Amino acid sequence: MSYTFSRRDFLKYSAMTAVAVAGAGLLTGCEIQDPNNPVIKKLGYGTTLGTTGGLLKSVDKDSTTGNGVFTFTVKNNSDAPLPMDPNESFVVKVLDKDGNSRWSNYFNLSIEAVPGADGKVPDILPQLPVRTVGEYKVHVPDYAGHAPNPEETLEFTFIPRPAKSPELRITWKILGADLVK
C-alpha cells in the first residue's frame, strides 16, 4: 500500500516545518551574522573575508606613551597587494555597556611590521604582498586612558580594501573583562 503525497499536504507540512525551524532558532538564541562583515567576540580568534584573513592576537597598553598596541596578523591570499594604511584600514572604539560609542580613534594611528624569527623586519609595508602573511603592531594614541572597563566593549575594525570596498570589514568586539591579564 502506498500513499500519494498531494500538493496540499506538501504545502501544509512545508509550512509546519518552516514554523518549527524558525521557532527553534528563537528558542536557542540563533544569531544571524552578515558574511560581509564578520564579528569575532574573542581575542586570539580570526576569520576570513573573501581572500583576506585577519587575527587579533593581543591588546596591550604602553605605559610610557599611553598608546594601545594591537598585535594583528593579516593573510593576503589575493592576486593584488593589500594596502596597510593605518588611518584608512583600522578603527578602534570603546563602547559603553549599552553599545554606544564612548571613545573612538581612526586617525594618527601608526603601524609597524613585527620582526620575524630571524630578527629581520619583513618588507610588508605600505602593502602586504600577494599571497603573504604579515604580522603588525598597530599603535593607537591615547588608548590607555580610554581602555574599556570590565562591562564595556572594545571594538577593533579592520577594513581590508578601504578605497575599493569600504563596506567590507572584519570586526572584533571584545568585552573589557576578557582583556584583563
Predicted regions and their residues:
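Low-complexity, acidic Ser/Thr/Pro/Gly-rich terminal tails and inter-domain linkers that flank the onset
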Residues: 35-63
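N-terminal secretory signal peptides and thylakoid transit peptides that target proteins
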Residues: 1-18
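Short, well-ordered beta-strand segments enriched in hydrophobic/aromatic residues
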Residues: 68-76
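The feature marks short-to-medium sequence segments in extracytoplasmic or secretory-pathway proteins
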Residues: 77-132
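C-terminal motif of bacterial Sec signal peptides marking the signal peptidase cleavage site
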Residues: 28-29
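Short structured motifs
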Residues: 53-59, 117-125, 139-141
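Solvent-exposed, conformationally flexible loop/turn segments
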Residues: 43-46, 65, 116-117, 127-133, ...
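Surface-exposed edge beta-strand/loop patches
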Residues: 134, 139-181
